[in-house]
């Protein structure tokens, strides 16, 4: 597995924060690093496989990656990221207690993926741009300024996370996308889902298309197919069982959609013919 080292990304040995844009981020094999990072998805779509679990990421997704996590990117489509790297929550010169603002693992569950709306994403970009402008300066005031900006970024992300920010349709759409991650196998009635998240059906279609580039049903099908591909690679369940588990009532229809999406059949993926290294 590829290991990324802080010496290759941080501007100096004393720097506690570094900015690493990926515009765009191509498919990238599984790796980990000796530093932590906050991945901010600017726009585009892709699959983020995090500690073996696949997540669909789009504009507004924020991922918190620790130094012992492993992850990869695949099936990217114009995926543009900004990575905010930091050595460790306790390696800041002027800040203490940052760990309390970061996601916390509870009973083996780590809430690694958050979502923010477009207006918050704009504020995030401004903070990141200010940090990036100061990267070449190593004096104490500049170091303190970068660390303060990092603290502001954490506060903004925490206050703007889905649990605390549902006042507009963009935030409700983000909550809907998070709900689909957990309920992708359910029979989805889009009228009922729109009502559940206080969106008109027209607004749901328009905003989801703007954010993901896909219609709601196309997005749901892709999400189901991504989950199915993960199970084909990492479980012993039959193709038919996996199809049903991922929300497809007809395994033949599932196989047709699967081949159309990935240019490989489910059996090809099961046998590793696509070249994926497990």
Swiss-Prot record:
Compartments reported by the entry: Cytoplasm
Superkingdom to which the source organism belongs: Bacteria
InterPro entries: AraC-bd, AraC_XylS_family_regulators, Homeodomain-like_sf, HTH-like, HTH_AraC, HTH_AraC-typ_CS, RhaR_RhaS-like_N, RmlC-like_jellyroll
CDD domains registered for this protein in UniProt: cupin_RhaR_RhaS-like_N
Pfam families: AraC_binding, HTH_18
The keyword Flavoprotein appears for this protein: no
Database matches in PROSITE patterns: HTH_ARAC_FAMILY_1, HTH_ARAC_FAMILY_2
SMART domains named in the record: HTH_ARAC
Keyword RNA-binding in record: no
Gene3D superfamilies, alphabetized: Homeodomain-like, Jelly Rolls
Keywords per UniProt: Activator, Cytoplasm, DNA-binding, Repeat, Rhamnose metabolism, Transcription, Transcription regulation
Any one Gene Ontology molecular-function term assigned to this protein's record: DNA-binding transcription factor activity
Membrane-spanning ranges: none
Positions bearing the site annotation: Interaction with sigma-70: 241, 250
Any GO CC annotation of this UniProt entry: cytoplasm
Chain ranges of the HTH araC/xylS-type domain: 174-272
GO biological process assignments: positive regulation of DNA-templated transcription; rhamnose metabolic process
Residue spans binding DNA: 191-212, 239-262
Quaternary assembly: Binds DNA as a dimer.
The protein's role, per its UniProt record: Activates expression of the rhaBAD and rhaT operons.
PANTHER family to which the protein is assigned, alphabetical: HTH-TYPE TRANSCRIPTIONAL ACTIVATOR RHAS (PTHR46796:SF13), HTH-TYPE TRANSCRIPTIONAL ACTIVATOR RHAS-RELATED (PTHR46796)
Protein name listed in UniProt: HTH-type transcriptional activator RhaS
Natural source organism: Escherichia coli O157:H7
Source taxonomy: Bacteria, Pseudomonadati, Pseudomonadota, Gammaproteobacteria, Enterobacterales
The encoding gene: rhaS
């Amino acid at each position: 597995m590829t290991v990324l080292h802080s010496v290759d990304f941080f501007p100096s040995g004393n720097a506690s924060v570094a900015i690493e844009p990926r515009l765009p981020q191509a498919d990238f094999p599984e790796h980990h690093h000796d530093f932590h990072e906050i991945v901010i998805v600017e726009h585009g779509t892709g699959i983020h496989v995090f500690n073996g679990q696949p997540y669909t990421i789009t504009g507004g997704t924020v991922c918190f990656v620790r130094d012992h996590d492993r992850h990869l990117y695949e099936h990217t489509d114009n995926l543009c990221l900004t990575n905010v790297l930091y050595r460790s929550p306790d390696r800041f010169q002027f800040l203490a207690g940052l760990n309390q603002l970061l996601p916390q693992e509870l009973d083996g569950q780590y809430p690694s993926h958050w979502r923010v709306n477009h207006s918050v994403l704009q504020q995030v970009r401004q903070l990141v741009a200010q940090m990036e402008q100061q990267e070449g300066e190593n004096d104490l005031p500049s170091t303190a300024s970068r660390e303060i900006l990092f603290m502001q970024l954490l506060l903004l992300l925490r206050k703007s996370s889905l649990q605390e920010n549902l006042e507009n349709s963009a935030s409700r759409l983000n909550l809907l996308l998070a709900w689909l991650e957990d309920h992708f196998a359910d029979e989805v009635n889009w009228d009922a889902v729109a009502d559940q998240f206080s969106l008109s059906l027209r607004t749901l279609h328009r905003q989801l298309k703007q954010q993901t580039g896909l219609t709601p049903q196309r997005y749901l099908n892709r999400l189901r197919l991504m989950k199915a591909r993960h199970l084909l690679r990492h479980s012993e369940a039959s193709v038919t069982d996996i199809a049903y588990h991922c929300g497809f009532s007809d395994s033949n229809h599932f196989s047709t959609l699967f081949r159309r999406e990935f240019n490989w059949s489910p059996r090809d993926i099961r046998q590793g013919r696509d070249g994926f290294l497990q």
